[in-house]
Amino acid sequence: MVDLLAKVDYRIVIVAFIVALIIAIVVWTIAYIEYRKLLRQRRIDRLIKRTRERAEDSGNESDGDTEELSTMVDMGNLRLLDVNDL
């Protein structure tokens, strides 16, 4: 066992450590990006729900929430409540 460790060059260990570090950074970056997407989607869903509730209560849609929602999803004119099956 000691002979096996003596044959391992320290450069291989350093390269393996660097590769593992790069892989860890890539994985955590992807996880963070997906987490941000999830938070954004939850916020959009909350705004859609609030807009629908206000439209049901008042008979018209809330322009403030619709405008905020359209800026979040980068659309000019978002017509969420023009669905025939509501």
From Swiss-Prot:
Residues 34-86 are cytoplasmic. The modification Phosphoserine is found at residues 58, 62. Residues 58-68 have a biased composition (Acidic residues). It is found in: Host membrane. Residues 1-12 are extracellular. The gene is vpu. This is Protein Vpu. Homopentamer. Interacts with host CD4 and BRTC; these interactions induce proteasomal degradation of CD4. Interacts with host BST2; this interaction leads to the degradation of host BST2. Interacts with host FBXW11. Interacts with host AP1M1; this interaction plays a role in the mistrafficking and subsequent degradation of host BST2. Interacts with host RANBP2; this interaction allows Vpu to down-regulate host BLM sumoylation. GO terms for cellular component: host cell membrane; membrane. It is a single-pass type I membrane protein. Ion channel activity is inhibited by hexamethylene amiloride in vitro. It comes from Human immunodeficiency virus type 1 group M subtype C (isolate ETH2220) (HIV-1).
